[in-house]
A protein has these predicted regions:
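Domain-level signature for soluble enzymes in the chorismate/prephenate branch of the shikimate pathway
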Residues: 1-376
C-alpha cells in the first residue's frame, strides 16, 4: 500500500494538470464568446449543453462517477457562460436594463392610493414614507390600488408585502407580477393589535370577531383563548372596525389599531393581543414608472424555471459568482401549471453596478418570464 503522503503528491500532480486544462478550456470559451458576439447568437444554448452532458457521461461506466462527471461539466459550462456574460458587459453589448436613475422620487402634487379605510395600517405606512399625503385616497382592494396606478389615477400605491409573524401577503406578490408597476421604496411599521367593540360593550359580550386574515393569524394564541368566538375575515382591519361601528352590536368586535378606535369611536376591550410583541409589517411603495434612486440598495426580481433537478441551483449560482448577497427567496405556485413555481428573490445591489448587470443578464437568459420588480 502506498504511503498517504505519496498518494497526496500524486493527487497534487493531477490537480495541477486539471488547473492547466481548465485554463485552456476557459481560453477556448472566450473564442466561443467572440464568435457569438459577432453572430448575435445567445450565450445559453440548452440543447448544445444537454448534448455535451450526454456525451461526456457516456464515457464513464461507474454510476457514481457518471453522476459526478455530469455535475463537473454542468459547473464548467456554467462558468463558461458567466465568463461570456462578462465579455458582453465589457464590450457594452449587453441589453440595457429598462430602468431610469432618478435623483429623488417625485413628491410634488402626487396622488397616493392605499387599500382599506381611514385608520388602516397601509395609511400609517403611507404617512411615514411620504411627507405630503394630502392628495391620498383609499380603495376597496389591493388590485384596485394597482389598477389605479396602471390607469394613471394615482402616482403611488402602498401595499403590504410581508408580516414578521404571518409571512408574505401572497396576493400582492402575484399582483407585482401581473401589473407592470415598479417598487420604489419600502416602509416597515410596528403592528399593535387591539380588540375593539362598540361603546359600552364588554369582553364577555363578544361572540363575533372581524379582521383581515393576516391580523387573525397574528392574534392566533389570543383567539385560541376565546374559541367560542366566531371569526370572520374582512378585506382590511380598518374596514372591520368601520363595520362594527356601523352595526352597533355589543356582540361584535374588530381586531385593528388603536388609531381606528379613535377614528370610529370604539372602545378598546383588550390591547397588545398579537402573538409577537415585535410584530411588524413591511409595505412596498409602487409606481408606474421604471425608476430607481442612485443610492438604492435592494433589488427584487422574479422568474420561472423548468421543473428539473438543479435548475434553481444554477440560477442562484449567479449571485455567488458575482458576490451578491441574497436577502430573501420565496416561491409562489403557477396556477396554470401544477407543482411548478415562480421564484421571488431580494438581494443587495444597485442596477448601476456591473456585478448586478452580469447576474441579471445571466438569469434573464437562463430563466423564463424574468422580471425586475424594483430597485429601492
Amino acid at each position: 500500500m502506498k504511503d498517504l503522503n505519496e498518494i497526496r503528491a500524486e493527487i497534487d500532480s493531477v490537480d495541477k494538470e486539471l488547473v492547466s486544462l481548465y485554463e485552456k478550456r476557459m481560453a477556448l470559451t472566450e473564442q466561443v464568446a467572440d464568435y457569438k458576439l459577432s453572430t448575435g447568437k445567445k450565450v445559453f444554448d440548452k440543447a448544445r449543453e444537454e448534448e455535451k452532458l450526454e456525451k461526456v457521461t457516456s464515457m464513464v461506466d461507474d454510476p457514481f462517477l457518471k453522476r459526478g462527471t455530469r455535475e463537473l461539466f454542468e459547473h464548467l459550462m456554467s462558468m463558461s457562460r458567466k465568463r461570456q456574460y462578462q465579455k458582453l458587459a465589457e464590450k457594452g453589448i449587453m441589453e440595457p436594463i429598462p430602468f431610469e436613475e432618478a435623483a429623488a422620487l417625485p413628491d410634488k402634487n402626487i396622488r397616493i392610493v392605499y387599500q382599506g379605510e381611514e385608520g388602516a395600517y397601509s395609511q400609517m405606512a403611507m404617512q411615514q414614507f411620504f411627507h405630503d399625503t394630502t392628495n391620498s385616497y383609499h380603495v376597496q382592494t389591493w388590485r384596485d390600488a394597482m389598477e389605479a396606478i396602471a390607469k394613471g389615477e394615482a402616482d403611488y400605491a402602498v401595499l403590504p408585502i410581508e408580516n414578521s409573524s404571518a409571512g408574505i401577503v401572497s396576493e400582492n406578490y402575484d399582483l407585482l407580477v401581473e401589473y407592470d408597476n415598479c417598487i420604489v421604496g419600502e416602509q416597515i411599521i410596528p403592528i399593535d393589535h387591539c380588540l375593539l367593540g362598540t361603546k359600552g360593550s364588554k369582553l364577555s359580550d363578544i361572540e363575533q370577531v372581524y379582521s383581515h386574515p393576516q391580523a387573525l393569524m397574528q392574534c392566533g394564541r389570543y383567539l385560541d383563548e376565546h374559541r367560542n368566538w366566531e371569526k370572520h375575515s374582512f378585506k382590511n382591519t380598518a374596514m372591520a372596525a368601520k363595520k362594527v361601528k356601523e352595526d352597533g352590536l355589543l356582540r361584535q368586535a374588530a381586531i385593528a389599531s388603536r388609531l381606528t378606535a379613535d377614528i370610529y369611536r370604539l372602545d378598546i376591550l383588550d390591547e397588545h393581543i398579537q402573538d409577537n410583541s415585535n410584530n411588524c409589517t413591511k409595505f412596498v411603495i409602487v409606481t408606474g414608472r421604471k425608476i430607481f434612486l442612485k443610492n438604492a440598495g435592494k433589488i427584487s426580481i422574479c422568474f420561472e424555471i423548468p421543473h428539473e433537478s438543479g435548475s434553481l441551483y444554477h440560477m442562484l449560482s449567479h449571485f455567488i459568482f458575482n458576490d451578491l448577497n441574497m436577502n430573501k427567496i420565496e416561491s409562489r405556485p403557477l396556477g396554470e401549471r401544477n407543482w411548478e413555481y415562480r421564484f421571488f428573490i431580494d438581494f443587495e445591489g444597485n442596477l448601476n453596478e456591473s456585478a448586478v448587470k452580469n447576474a441579471l443578464h445571466g438569469i434573464k437568459e437562463e430563466a423564463e418570464n424574468f422580471k425586475i420588480l424594483g430597485n429601492y
